């Protein structure tokens, strides 16, 4: 694999080399669960879902961790507004988050720790920093001393001395007055009346935002990970502070690669809840925008570039998805009428794309797809391959949908079957699927057993049964990827 990724830390696009060959450890900053997710969240998590899918498709064993921030001032404020509790607000919005991400076909992370579940690790990490002189107590709070960490500012390019000069003579609030430097940040916040609090060596209180992620990365993945993900708005202060506190504690690099997606803009401004110009994922879907249209809209732009949200752009994505969806559904709906082997038979090596009369052209398109994705996740280039594959399939699907004859010689129709097979496989890598798929409640063992039954049916040339099993799994949100040598991999939608 020749994957190259843009590393915010080095400001270069570099070859990706995992810490452990064949494996990748990834941490993605999750949401603060005080409200519904908006389109900016959708963009971020769709982009990183595609990164994960591509790594899996290329044979890596990926461990993907994404957190929930369930202790925060915003959650406390929302709880007060709703006459509720921090826990109740968090639980409601965690449930809503899962519903939204499932609808968009985003694979669930392998683990999703919550800040409230990691308090022991948080307190331990703060204690280590204090023992090393990188943190100090002040009136029940504990702060990280940025001047004690030589590398502070390496991710964002912030200059500490310049910030110190700018702050000189400024009238500070009570918290600023307790800090040794304007960039010092809270690791532990002393308890306030009426707010939830937790015991600690520094008194009752709650953790700061940044230390939560450092503790969860360490607990779930270790001191150093392969890739750390987030939006561009997290570079400073959140990710800068994560690096400082983690590396001050361990003396090791926190992440080899830092990746950040661009923002969604509305009228030239970043979409955000603070500006009030956001559109929730739920509102978009309830307005009739299909989940795959939204996914296609996001993937048409490079993940690092700003994405302008307009009605025209969304309509263009809807048109594009309509054509792709028609092409993807061709083999499922019309294989008998076209005289194609069943979808299960198509996955057999003997009649796959490799032996098609168009084998060279199909292989070139697959390599073009891989090349685009390996070029810093160029999803728009990868989509161009899907549209190229889909063009003759879509035209044929449209004729059949109208009740017309196929209008092609029998040999040409048969030669389109491997093309459809490749389209379906590459679409799974981008998370694009027919929208009748649901969510599976099957456990891994049941899925593996069902796939084994499908493999046995194929070996017995009982392709109708193999197709029935595949369709049953698809209906439950289990996507199958048939590979040469009779290997079948699966992922949950």
Swiss-Prot record:
Q: Which residues bind Zn(2+)?
A: 29, 213, 238, 242
Q: In the Enzyme Commission scheme, what number(s) does this protein have?
A: 6.1.1.16
Q: Which UniProt keywords apply?
A: Aminoacyl-tRNA synthetase, ATP-binding, Cytoplasm, Ligase, Metal-binding, Nucleotide-binding, Protein biosynthesis, Zinc
Does the keyword field hold Protein biosynthesis? yes
Which Gene Ontology cellular component terms are annotated?
Answer: cytosol
| An annotated Gene Ontology molecular function | ATP binding
Q: Which InterPro entries match?
A: Cys-tRNA-ligase, Cys-tRNA-synt_Ia_DALR, Cys-tRNA/MSH_ligase, Rossmann-like_a/b/a_fold, tRNA-synt_1_cat_dom, tRNAsynth_Ia_anticodon-bd
Q: What is the top-level taxon of the source organism?
A: Bacteria
Location in the cell reads: Cytoplasm
Q: Where is the signal peptide?
A: none
Q: Which GO terms describe its biological process?
A: cysteinyl-tRNA aminoacylation
CDD domains given in the database record: CysRS_core
Motif interval(s): 'KMSKS' region: 270-274
- Chain positions recorded as ATP binding sites: 273
According to its UniProt record, what is one Pfam family this protein matches?
DALR_2
Q: What cofactor does this chain's UniProt record say it requires?
A: Zn(2+)
How many cofactors are bound and how?
Binds 1 zinc ion per subunit.
Question: Which reaction equation describes what this protein catalyses?
Answer: tRNA(Cys) + L-cysteine + ATP = L-cysteinyl-tRNA(Cys) + AMP + diphosphate
Give the residue ranges of motif 'HIGH' region. 31-41
Query: How does this chain assemble?
Result: Monomer.
Q: Which family does it belong to?
A: Belongs to the class-I aminoacyl-tRNA synthetase family.
Supply the name of the protein.
Answer: Cysteine--tRNA ligase
Name the source organism: Parasynechococcus marenigrum (strain WH8102)
Taxon lineage = Bacteria, Bacillati, Cyanobacteriota, Cyanophyceae, Synechococcales
Please state the gene responsible for encoding this protein: cysS
């Amino acid at each position: 694999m020749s994957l190259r990724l843009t590393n915010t830390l080095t400001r270069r696009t570099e070859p990706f080399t995992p810490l452990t060959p064949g494996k990748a450890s990834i941490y993605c900053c999750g949401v603060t669960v005080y409200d519904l997710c908006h389109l900016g969240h959708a963009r971020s998590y769709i982009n990183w879902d595609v990164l994960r899918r591509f790594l899996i498709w290329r044979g890596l064993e990926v461990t993907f961790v994404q957190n929930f921030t369930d202790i925060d001032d915003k959650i406390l404020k929302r709880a007060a507004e709703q006459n509720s509790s921090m826990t109740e607000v968090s639980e409601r919005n965690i449930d809503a988050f899962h519903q939204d991400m499932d609808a968009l076909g985003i694979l669930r992370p392998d683990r999703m720790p919550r800040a409230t579940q990691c308090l022991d690790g948080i307190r331990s990490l703060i204690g280590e920093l204090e023992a090393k002189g990188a943190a100090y107590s002040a009136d029940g709070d504990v702060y990280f001393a940025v001047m004690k960490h030589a590398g502070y500012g390496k991710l964002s390019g912030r200059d500490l001395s310049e910030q110190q000069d700018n702050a000189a003579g400024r009238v500070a609030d009570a918290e600023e007055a307790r800090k040794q430097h304007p960039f010092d940040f809270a690791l532990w916040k002393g308890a306030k009346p009426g707010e939830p609090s937790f015991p600690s060596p520094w008194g009752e209180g709650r953790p700061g935002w940044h230390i939560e992620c450092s503790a969860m990365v360490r607990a779930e993945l270790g001191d150093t990970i392969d890739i750390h993900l987030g939006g561009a708005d997290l570079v400073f202060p959140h990710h800068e502070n994560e690096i400082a506190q983690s590396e001050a504690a361990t003396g090791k690099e926190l992440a080899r690669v830092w990746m950040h997606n661009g923002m969604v803009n509305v009228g030239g401004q970043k979409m955000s809840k603070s500006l009030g110009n956001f559109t929730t994922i739920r509102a978009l879907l309830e307005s009739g925008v299909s989940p795959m249209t939204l996914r296609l809209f996001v993937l048409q732009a490079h993940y690092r570039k700003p994405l302008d949200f307009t009605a025209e752009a969304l309509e263009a994505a809807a048109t594009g998805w309509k054509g792709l969806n028609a092409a993807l559904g061709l083999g499922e709906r019309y294989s008998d009428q076209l005289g194609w082997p069943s979808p299960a038979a198509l996955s057999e090596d003997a009649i796959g794309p490799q032996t098609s009369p168009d084998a060279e052209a199909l292989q070139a398109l697959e390599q073009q797809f891989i090349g685009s994705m390996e070029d810093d996740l160029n999803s728009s280039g990868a989509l161009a391959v899907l549209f190229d594959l889909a063009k003759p399939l879509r035209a044929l699907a449209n004729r059949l949908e109208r009740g017309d004859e196929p209008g092609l010689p029998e040999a040409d129709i048969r030669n389109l079957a491997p093309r459809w097979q490749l389209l379906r496989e590459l679409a799974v890598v981008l998370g694009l699927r027919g929208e009748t798929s649901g969510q599976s409640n099957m456990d891994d063992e049941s899925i593996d057993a069902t796939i084994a039954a499908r493999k046995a049916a194929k070996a017995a040339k009982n392709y109708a049964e193999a197709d029935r099993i595949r369709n049953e799994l698809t209906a439950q949100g289990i996507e199958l990827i048939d590979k040469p040598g009779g290997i079948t991999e699966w992922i949950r939608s």
